[in-house]
Amino acid sequence: MPTPSMEDYLERIYLLIEEKGYARVSDIAEALEVHPSSVTKMVQKLDKSDYLVYERYRGLILTAKGKKIGKRLVYRHDLLEDFLKMIGVDSDHIYEDVEGIEHHLSWDAIDRIGDLVQYFQEDPSRLNDLREVQKKNEE
């Protein structure tokens, strides 16, 4: 199981490859706002853990294992953003809130949040009911 730091790298690498078709150390460093040497160290760890294949000066590719977890991490992040928006969290705080909680939730909790998002999406009146409760609580 990857550490939270490994998850951050895998998520970003997955997104870069989806967006650009590749991910270089410099791209990862820029996206995560870290020094390239830190990226190189982490990429080597991810290589040893079979999440990716890294060839110095040539780049990296995600293994099937790396792609699977990367896709799941992106799903988790997006789901949590959607959920926080849905329940009315201020958009200025959503990214930081997601970053703060995503590594601390079990996959079971993520699945239950997914169920709740689906529950609200299937019947918009449920979300309206939530808004009414929130209005009452703000008074």
Curated annotation (Swiss-Prot):
Activity regulation description: DNA binding is strongly activated by Mn(2+).
Keyword Transcription regulation (UniProt): yes
An annotated Gene Ontology molecular function: DNA binding
Pfam families: Fe_dep_repr_C, Fe_dep_repress
Residues where Mn(2+) 1 binds: 8, 99, 102-103
Residue numbers binding Mn(2+) 2: 11, 77, 99, 102
GO biological process terms, semicolon-separated: intracellular manganese ion homeostasis
Subcellular location: Cytoplasm
GO CC, any one term: cytoplasm
Keywords of this entry: Activator, Cytoplasm, DNA-binding, Manganese, Metal-binding, Repressor, Transcription, Transcription regulation
Keyword Transmembrane assigned: no
Positions of the HTH dtxR-type domain: 1-63
Tree of life domain: Bacteria
Function: Central regulator of manganese homeostasis.
Assembly information from the UniProt record: Homodimer.
HAMAP family in alphabetical order: HTH_MntR
Similarity comment: family membership: Belongs to the DtxR/MntR family.
UniProt protein name: HTH-type transcriptional regulator MntR
Species this chain originates from: Halalkalibacterium halodurans (strain ATCC BAA-125 / DSM 18197 / FERM 7344 / JCM 9153 / C-125)
Gene: mntR
